[in-house]
Amino acid sequence: MWIKRQEGYCLKEIAGVHYLLPYGQKVADQRKGIVLNETGVFLWNELKTSMTDDALAEKLVHYYSADGEAANETQDEIQDQTKDKIQNQMQDQIQDQIRQDVKQFVQELLSLAILQECLRPCCAEDANDATCVYPTKEPFVECLEIAGMRIALYGSRELISSQFDAFLKDCSSAQGKSKSELQTESQIKMQIKMPVQMQIEILQRTTSFHPNGKTLIRNEELVVCENEQGYIILFPSMNQIREAHMTSDGRFAQIYVNGLDKEKTKEELFHAIRHFFLFFAQRQGFFAIHSASILYRDQVWLFSGHSGMGKSTHTNLWKEQFGTEIINGDLNLIGWSNGEQTNIGQNVDKPDSKGHPIVYGMPWCGTSGIASTKSYPLGGIVLLGRSDNDHFESLTNDQKIVRVMQRMISPVWTEDMLETNLKCAAKLAKEVPIYYLLCT
């Protein structure tokens, strides 16, 4: 667990006693101050930078196992129990006790919102290295592969929807491993045979206090806030999901659930994971369009329009009249391929890259229940509208770009994300036919 100080607390020595005192908003929130002994002061000072609770414990073990004489000269005010630990030369059981004491200290300060859990970059030396993994509390359970992107899932297998089954990838030998066997980054690397680009950890517990930061969007279904650690995401309409945290690059997300209703939790997680995947996919040059799709003459055609506009009606008519296969009943993922296998994170096809647009299969398909794991070239896009008679209307280039962009469900939390979606829509308008079909 990575931890860091909360903003709004300062350490003050008053008449020889060390106090951790709140200020600013923490006072307005009626947060309390606490007294720290010398060990607590040492731990607080070490937390100037974020670290794991294990690393913090090791620092304290090293601190107490330093030169014995020097330690006795400078630690006159340490509690008798701590002196005994030093005098016993830090026996293994004493070191274990110190580690337990540190974890208890951390948990107490987390409960008081003096410390906070944080998401830490997995490989600070190379954040783009796809072989890097984030340490997780929960065991590895499944690996998904969608459009060449591999997503490792951690937590309880009983919470993973069967709707992911067709997209499961055997990329690990970690099946059946206990939590203790998969705690460190190096251990996780050993268990995962193939590089994963994204990790999602499902935790059945409450989260510690986190500052919300700047609210980017808020509606009845989704709340997204941005802080220095990344994003905090809430799902107001979901009862089983408490909240979620995601790094700024989208490579690691933690979803906190109550898990009281397993089936409901499984259903909500399936839909919630889509948001994290689409955020990460957008950064890799993949974009989702709200549309139903058919396979016609080895190319996929998208029918896109507002709800109730007739997407399913059109695709079903094509199936009835021409025997075309329906690829996805609600959502289609588009990327670009130059004929070579995409190497995510290194040779990823961005919206401004060369190549032909490809429709990639993914598990999310609305209520249609129709999804595919296959990928095909994109033939074109048919935008649907209402009219008193059936006819096509020509669209100007700007209309094509804007209307396709408006049919995307790739995130637009920021201006940069909007710009990215517009670039994708402009590339589509240039490379494939886009029609506007009005029907009664």
Feature locations, PLM:
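Hydrophobic positions on the alpha1 helix immediately C-terminal to the Walker A/P-loop
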Residues: H314
